[in-house]
């Protein structure tokens, strides 16, 4: 187990969550993204 890796993954998933929220509020991006809805 590598603590630095875990922190990096947390940061990455937080960024992904933010991007996902932004994308899913945009009709075109939301339609193209399977994780929206």
Curated annotation (Swiss-Prot):
Residue ranges of the TM segments: none
List of residues that carry Cysteine amide: 36
Consequence of changing residue 35 to A: 4.4-fold and 1.3-fold decrease in inhibitory potency on alpha-3-beta-4/CHRNA3-CHRNB4 and alpha-6-beta-4/CHRNA6-CHRNB4 nAChRs, respectively
Remaining remarks: Negative results: does not show inhibition at neuronal alpha-4-beta-4/CHRNA4-CHRNB4, alpha-4-beta-2/CHRNA4-CHRNB2, alpha-6/alpha-3-beta-2-beta-3 (CHRNA6/CHRNA3-CHRNB2-CHRNB3), alpha-3-beta-2/CHRNA3-CHRNB2, alpha-2-beta-2/CHRNA2-CHRNB2, alpha-9-alpha-10/CHRNA9-CHRNA10, alpha-7/CHRNA7 nAChRs and muscle alpha-1-beta-1-delta-epsilon/CHRNA1-CHRNB1-CHRND-CHRNE nAChR.
Disulphide bridges: 23-29, 24-36
Upper taxonomic lineage: Eukaryota, Metazoa, Spiralia, Lophotrochozoa, Mollusca
Designated name of the protein: Alpha-conotoxin TxID
Location of the protein in the cell: Secreted
Modifications the protein undergoes after translation, according to the UniProt entry: Unmodified Met-32 is essential for toxin binding to rat alpha-3-beta-4/CHRNA3-CHRNB4 nAChR. An oxidation of this methionine provokes a 13.3-fold decrease in inhibitory potency (IC(50)=245 nM instead of 18 nM). Owing to its potent activity, derivatives of this toxin have a potential in the development of a novel drug. Unfortunately, the oxidation of the methionine is readily to happen during toxin synthesis and oxidation steps as well as under oxidative environment in vivo, which should still be considered to find a solution to this major drawback.
Function text: Alpha-conotoxins act on postsynaptic membranes, they bind to the nicotinic acetylcholine receptors (nAChR) and thus inhibit them. This toxin inhibits alpha-3-beta-4/CHRNA3-CHRNB4 (IC(50)=3.6-18.38 nM), alpha-6/alpha-3-beta-4 (CHRNA6/CHRNA3-CHRNB4) (IC(50)=33.9-94.1 nM), and alpha-2-beta-4/CHRNA2-CHRNB4 (IC(50)=4550 nM) nAChRs. The toxin competes with agonists in the orthosteric binding site of alpha-3-beta-4/CHRNA3-CHRNB4 and alpha-6-beta-4/CHRNA6-CHRNB4.
Keyword presence, Membrane: no
Effect of residue 30 to K: Become completely selective for alpha-3-beta-4/CHRNA3-CHRNB4 over alpha-6-beta-4/CHRNA6-CHRNB4 nAChRs
Cellular component GO terms held in the UniProt record: extracellular region; host cell postsynaptic membrane
Known outcome of mutating residue 27 to A: Complete loss in inhibitory potency on both alpha-3-beta-4/CHRNA3-CHRNB4 and alpha-6-beta-4/CHRNA6-CHRNB4 nAChRs
Effect of substituting residue 22 to A: 17-fold and 8-fold decrease in inhibitory potency on alpha-3-beta-4/CHRNA3-CHRNB4 and alpha-6-beta-4/CHRNA6-CHRNB4 nAChRs, respectively
Tissue expression summary: Expressed by the venom duct.
GO molecular function, one term: toxin activity
Keywords recorded for this protein, A-Z: Acetylcholine receptor inhibiting toxin, Amidation, Disulfide bond, Neurotoxin, Postsynaptic neurotoxin, Secreted, Toxin
Entry text on domains: The cysteine framework is I (CC-C-C). Alpha4/6 pattern.
The family this protein is said to belong to: Belongs to the conotoxin A superfamily.
């Amino acid at each position: 187990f590598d603590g630095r890796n875990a922190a990096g993954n947390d940061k990455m998933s937080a960024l992904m969550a933010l991007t996902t929220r932004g994308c899913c509020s945009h009709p075109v991006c939301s339609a193209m993204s399977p994780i929206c809805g």
